[in-house]
Amino acid sequence: MNDTVEKSIERAKVLIESLPYMQEFRHKTIVIKYGGHAMVDEALKKQFALDVILLKQIGINPIIVHGGGPQINNLLDRLDIKPSYVQGMRVTDGETMDVVEMVLVGKVNKEIVGLINHCGGKAVGLSGRDGDLVCAEQLQMNQAQVGDNPPELIDVGRVGQVTKINSHVLETLSQDDFIPIIAPVGVGEDGRAFNINADLVASAIAAELSAEKLILLTDVPGVKNKAGDLLTTLEWQELNGLIEDGTIMGGMIPKVRCCEDAVKGGVAKTYIVDGRVEHAILLEIFTRDGVGTEIY
């Protein structure tokens, strides 16, 4: 048996291994937060597009929510607009919000849609303002309490939190075999735009749709223990203890909280996955061991 035949047999085995998962998840919704290095590396960008198209072709319903922080910062630098942060949160005034919406909706979203369509898929770009898809209000943040003084409210401008997801537009697009690509810009009651963390939008959409899975693509392998080993599965009830003892810290805390909210909202399973790994989405969905950290 020559090498070519052996390689073909291995490919066939991979397909057979994935068959039960294809059958299990057919007609199910999977929400994917697309961000990090996977959005800027050209090879990974194309692999992501092809992976999403494959999901749609085999009957799975993928919904994509994307980030774009580095692209926003690049344009702010070019316009000589100095960003300011409070407790790690970008303060978004009216001028900054214009840039955020311009980049997320007008550039990043269209590039993702264009790539998927170029690769043979049917993608449609949306922002949370379209069809009032993502309704929002201003995020409330408090300064740390000092002594007996009550904590003061911090004005972070047009930074929003999700109040409601109007899922009808997503359901309609999915039924017509389109892949929705969503920019995380929400709309307030007064019609103003709000900048919302993409993880939060993805989590809220997944919960509203009772999605089978929520996958957050990141630039780390997943949640690790204090020894640096990957924690492959976690129950959401374990998260508070891991945060309190310092196992989970920094930017990983809001990500696991998004997963917790999604599970409490009816999502079957959530995942924090290293988007730098080739075909990370397919490995998570269609292999026994998966990749990253599963939170359920």
UniProtKB/Swiss-Prot annotation:
Gene Ontology MF term list: acetylglutamate kinase activity; ATP binding
Q: What InterPro entries does the database record attribute to this sequence?
A: AceGlu_kinase-like_sf (IPR036393), AcgluKinase_fam (IPR004662), ArgB (IPR037528), Asp/Glu/Uridylate_kinase (IPR001048), Glu/AcGlu_kinase (IPR001057), NAGK-C (IPR041727)
Q: Where is this site: Transition state stabilizer?
A: K33, K255
Q: Name one GO biological process term.
A: L-arginine biosynthetic process
Q: Does Signal appear among the keywords?
A: no
Residues annotated for substrate binding in this entry? G68, G69, R90, N195
Q: Which UniProt keywords are present, listed alphabetically?
A: Amino-acid biosynthesis, Arginine biosynthesis, ATP-binding, Cytoplasm, Kinase, Nucleotide-binding, Transferase
The EC code for this enzyme is 2.7.2.8
Q: In which pathway does it act?
A: Amino-acid biosynthesis; L-arginine biosynthesis; N(2)-acetyl-L-ornithine from L-glutamate: step 2/4
In terms of NCBIfam families, this protein maps to: argB
PANTHER family linked to this entry: N-ACETYLGLUTAMATE SYNTHASE (PTHR23342), N-ACETYLGLUTAMATE SYNTHASE, MITOCHONDRIAL (PTHR23342:SF0)
Please give the family membership noted in the entry.
Belongs to the acetylglutamate kinase family. ArgB subfamily.
Functional summary from the UniProt entry: Catalyzes the ATP-dependent phosphorylation of N-acetyl-L-glutamate.
- The molecule here is called Acetylglutamate kinase
Source species of the chain: Desulfotalea psychrophila (strain LSv54 / DSM 12343)
